[in-house]
Amino acid sequence: KHEMLKVVNFLDTILPKDKPRYLMGVGTPADLIENILNGVDMFDCVIPTRNARNSQLFNYDGKLNIRNSKYKDDFTPIDTNGFSVSSEIYSKAYLHHLFKTNEVLGLRIATEHNLKFYIHLMNQVKIQIKNDNFEKWAKEFLERYNNE
């Protein structure tokens, strides 16, 4: 990861600023933010859906593996940031149960959650860039996200 960031940072110095920049196969929330800081405009990755199918959910505080036994009796919502109705309706315990029993609904809820989180995250990026606040916001996001 460190090498990739070094290469992208170097490419930022030599690629034209007025052309779109595409980075393929990079897709954790932290990777997206770090690479946007380095001038990348577009991404293409399966991480939100693949990780959802493997019981991993993303949120602003990092990621959580919903199969983990600590969620068995956790009746708090999956997320409360308001970007997904299903994330506020379903509890972590319920989603944990769905994954443990191999119920397909669990995959669907987790996938919807991750995709809506990514959409919300990228909308926040756009807002922060428009407000000329992206670097500060990105630093705060990365500190919070990587501090899981």
Each predicted region: which residue ranges?
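Glycine-rich phosphate/ribose-binding loops and adjacent secondary-structure elements
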Residues: K1-I78
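C-terminal extensions of enzymes
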Residues: D79-E148
